[in-house]
Amino acid sequence: MHNPVFSLKEVCFSYLDKFPALVAVDMDIQAGQKISIIGANGSGKSTLLHLLDGLIFADKGGFSFCGKEISERSFEDIAFSRDFRRRVGFVFQDPDVQLFCPSVKEDIVFGPLQLGLGRNETQDRMEKLVNTLAIQDLLDRSPNQLSIGEKRKVALASTLIIQPEILILDEPTAGLDPTTTRHIIDLLMDENIAGKTIITSTHDLHIVEEISDMVYVFGQERRIVKSGLPDSILNDAVLLAENNLAHVHSHRHKDKVHAHAHVHLEHHKEEH
């Protein structure tokens, strides 16, 4: 059996050496899997994704990529660093982090040109992507003139153009309308069918079953409290309520009090 693309063994990470963000995380991710990371705000989801992308490094425990132990020193090897950046793509929760060039077109082609891809190949890839994402009319615009949905599409294009084997996405559908959400999910599933490993953090439990074949639930102690198949996680009302992923409503019927878990909706807010 091949090595997992990512393997974490008892991984811990703290900010400033005193604010725990990941506690004893164990996880193996195989090539071609669809992984969802769910949990309340502050539970460690984004920190985990940053670690997988080599933006931060474990304080304790073991972290490997395709069988190679990863540390800050690993990226001092230019050949390894370039290979990793070609194979692993990251889409940030805040698209503005990725969009820093004067125009959308320059943002999309920045990554592959930095990695040494030829201009003709880069242009061909860009043309295909902008058609797929329906962002042809945005190419000459400044990113700061775009809506959040447009920015997310451009950020996704700037990652997909590298053609990574592994795609890591932090809340890719947050704040999007249902049509744009559907478009992005369909694109991600097409990428998975084509062989890509997809790792997504999300609060939108209504997309989890479609975008996952394994789900990891993070609790407020910044550790994995449960992992399993999507249906087993999503049907565990107690688990979701205990980890602030569902409301629990109660009402009295005659002499009994009944409690019901209510899953958060990404595009729906209740007034209480």
Spans of model-derived segments:
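Conserved ABC ATPase "signature" region
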Residues: 120-138
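Helix-to-loop junction immediately C-terminal to a conserved catalytic motif
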Residues: 53
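H-loop/switch region of ABC-family ATPase nucleotide-binding domains
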Residues: 202-203
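Conserved ABC ATPase signature
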Residues: 142-146
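Catalytic Walker B motif of ABC-type/P-loop ATPase nucleotide-binding domains
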Residues: 167-170
